[in-house]
């Protein structure tokens, strides 16, 4: 991982980092903010809506989310996020991941949640989210808890998707979009 670049290289599955719990952060300092800034750059470059720190090889409880609603960037930084409420009402979305390129799966999650976290400056926050935002937050925090969106699927479905992903990676090697990118 090149520390001089303004972004990180995405870690691709299969990788043991996705089975590990991310570590809590004691103090939000400039080092943590640098990690966040680079993660936000990844989000922008990859045109993604969410990213957990372990997806860039960092085992810290950090997630960034930006739904880009109305073509406007409104990033939310979650440091040490903890979901304190899950609604009983569920919703299903087709989910994918930068770390699992070329595959998607229908995943059912709580329609509404409440999450406590520290923001970019280390201030305590609480957010009530519903709909797609709630799904994205649950998806990213799941990564920090050592799980992925595929873990809720049957072994057969998961294995089929992983084979499809490996074939996709072979045909379309993942890369960071940039000035040398031709698409």
UniProtKB/Swiss-Prot annotation:
A Pfam match: Pep_deformylase
Highest taxon of source: Bacteria
Record: active site: 140
GO biological process: translation
InterPro entries reported for this sequence: Peptide_deformylase, Peptide_deformylase_sf
CDD domains, sorted: Pep_deformylase
An MF annotation (GO) of this entry: peptide deformylase activity
Family: Belongs to the polypeptide deformylase family.
PANTHER family noted in UniProt: PEPTIDE DEFORMYLASE
Protein name: Peptide deformylase-like
Lineage summary: Bacteria, Pseudomonadati, Pseudomonadota, Alphaproteobacteria, Rickettsiales
């Amino acid at each position: 991982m090149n520390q001089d670049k303004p972004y990180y290289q995405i870690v691709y599955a299969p990788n043991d980092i996705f089975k590990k719990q991310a570590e809590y952060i004691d103090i939000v300092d400039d080092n943590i903010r640098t990690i966040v800034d680079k993660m936000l750059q990844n989000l922008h470059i990859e045109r993604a809506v969410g990213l957990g720190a372990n997806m860039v090889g960092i085992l810290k409880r950090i997630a960034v989310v930006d739904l880009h609603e109305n073509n406007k960037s409104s990033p939310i930084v979650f440091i040490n996020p903890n979901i304190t409420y899950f609604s009983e009402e569920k919703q299903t979305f087709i989910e994918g991941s930068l770390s699992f390129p070329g595959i998607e799966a229908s995943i059912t999650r709580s329609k509404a949640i409440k999450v406590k976290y520290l923001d970019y400056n280390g201030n305590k926050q609480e957010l009530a989210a519903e709909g797609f935002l709630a799904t994205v937050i649950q998806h990213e925090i799941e990564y920090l808890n050592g799980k992925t969106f595929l873990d809720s699927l049957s072994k057969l479905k998961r294995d089929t998707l992983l084979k499809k992903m490996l074939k996709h990676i072979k045909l379309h090697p993942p890369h960071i979009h940039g000035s040398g990118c031709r698409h």
